[in-house]
Swiss-Prot record:
Protein name per Swiss-Prot or TrEMBL: V-type ATP synthase beta chain
BP GO terms, sorted: proton motive force-driven plasma membrane ATP synthesis
Lineage: Bacteria, Pseudomonadati, Spirochaetota, Spirochaetia, Spirochaetales
Residue spans crossing the bilayer: none
GO molecular function terms listed in the Swiss-Prot or TrEMBL record: ATP binding; proton-transporting ATP synthase activity, rotational mechanism
Organism listed in the record: Borreliella afzelii (strain PKo)
Domain of life (superkingdom): Bacteria
């Protein structure tokens, strides 16, 4: 039953308060102002005092305006017609296409029963050596991409969306600059991936509260497709904007702040979204990659700090590259023993030598004498960074492993690598150029 009220008790920021009965948490309402109407959601219940956040903002809203409660929580249409479409944070078309009102599903439900989950066991190939070789992305994994403003994290998401071997991409943007939104849209269209992509976007020009629904709507749709047997990759950017929106609402609601003004339930709110990652027995899966920008490159900032306790590793994007030392995929050992017998050896050896090369780079910068071993390490460092770490590199895993052997053979002798003899005999390039 729809209930209509015509008296607003208070207006604070994007939050209005009314006195109403029989209202449930999360229920939607329509706020009808003089010249417009806007969707609102119940975010707090205090007996008969009901607080709602207005998605379109409260500009132009007066205390005498009408509030019509709809009797249900946020819903979104679910069907194959979503593919190739672009929507806003409320599920309304943003691409000029028709509205979709059939087969509505509620968003923001609980995570799947743990007994329905299976142990992660399949690799997701991305064509990026720094992921596929060194920190393999595993189906049903949840990983953040830690970065700072100015790094090409959205460009990285575009490459993953274009190259990842999955059935479906769901892209959720929060606080996107309009140029970034157009970059996503144009790149996916040119790359031919828009037909397998669903885009839910909130731009920096939209009401800040609308960004709160983007992860929930993206993950709810992903779950339905996963239950239909689809391998779904959810790409979210930027979870710090999502947390900042929660912070703004909590301040408006005069809640007791926690670390740096964020709400006390920040960890729970983030975990609730990340725990949607799952591999269903006999069905599909949901894998989550979420950009999390770190203000001031501070990993102790509440958003990345809490995220690190929830997820199964992280990718660090620094200097336009995925940093090998800070990045970690905790589930990579579940799959990299099943790819090729030299995978783990190449991974360990190349990272070990690259770490050693950093000492040689410092020695050269400080003017110390360079040994022949230092010269080899410097050559190796340059080749590793240009051929492996560059984000423009797009090669299959097997070619990346072969490339690893070529780089090693170009810089070192077999003995200098410390690799076992049986693998040397099997994979070492015939022409040694060390």
């Amino acid at each position: 039953m729809k209930r209509v009220y015509s008296k607003i008790e208070s207006i604070a920021g994007n939050v209005i308060t009314v006195t109403a009965q029989g209202i449930k948490y999360g229920e939607l309402a329509i706020v009808k102002a003089k010249d417009t109407s806007s969707l609102a959601e119940v975010i707090k219940l205090d007996r008969e005092k009901v607080s709602l956040q207005v998605y379109g903002g409260t500009r132009g809203v007066s205390t005498s305006d009408e509030i019509k409660f709809l009797g249900h929580t946020m819903q979104v249409s679910f069907s194959d017609n979503l593919l190739g479409r672009i929507f806003d944070g409320s599920g309304n078309p943003r691409d000029g296409g028709p509205s979709l009102d059939d087969n509505l599903i509620e968003i923001g439900g609980p995570s799947a029963n743990p007994t329905k989950r299976i142990v992660p066991r399949n690799m997701i190939r991305t064509g990026l050596p720094m992921i596929d070789v060194f920190n393999t992305l595993v189906e049903s994994q949840k990983l953040p991409i830690f970065s700072v403003s100015g790094e090409p994290y959205n460009e990285l998401l575009v490459r993953i969306a274009l190259q990842a071997e999955v059935d479906l991409i769901i892209l959720g943007g929060m606080g996107l600059k309009h140029d970034d939104y157009l970059t996503f849209k144009d790149s996916l269209e040119k790359g031919g991936a828009l037909s397998r992509t669903i885009f839910f976007v909130h731009t920096a020009n939209d009401s800040v509260v609308e960004s709160l629904t983007v992860p929930d709507i993206s993950l709810s749709v992903a779950e339905k497709f996963a239950l239909k047997g689809k391998k779904v990759l959810v790409l979210l950017t930027d979870m710090t904007n999502f947390a900042d929106a929660m912070k703004e609402i909590s301040i408006t609601m005069e809640q007791v702040p926690s670390n740096r003004g964020y709400p006390g339930d920040l960890y729970s709110q983030l975990a609730y979204r990340y725990e949607k990652a799952i591999d269903f027995e006999g069905a599909g899966s949901i894998t989550i990659l979420a950009v999390t920008t770190m203000p001031g490159d501070d990993v102790t900032h509440p958003v990345p700090d809490n995220t690190g306790y929830i997820t199964e590793g992280q990718y660090y994007l620094k200097g336009g590259r995925i940093e090998p030392f800070g990045s970690l995929s905790r589930l990579k050992q579940m799959v990299n023993s099943k790819t090729r017998d030299d995978h783990r050896t190449i991974m360990d050896t190349m990272i070990k030598l690259y770490a050693s090369s950093k000492e040689s780079v410092e020695k050269k910068a400080m003017g110390f004498n360079m040994t022949k071993w230092d010269e080899k390490l410097l050559k190796y460092s340059n080749m590793f960074e240009s051929k492996m770490m560059d984000l423009s590199v797009n090669i299959p895993l097997e070619e990346a492993l072969d490339l690893g052997w070529d780089i090693l053979a170009s810089c070192f002798s077999p003995k200098e690598t410390g690799i076992k003899t049986d693998l040397i005999q099997k994979y070492w390039p015939k022409k040694e150029t060390y």
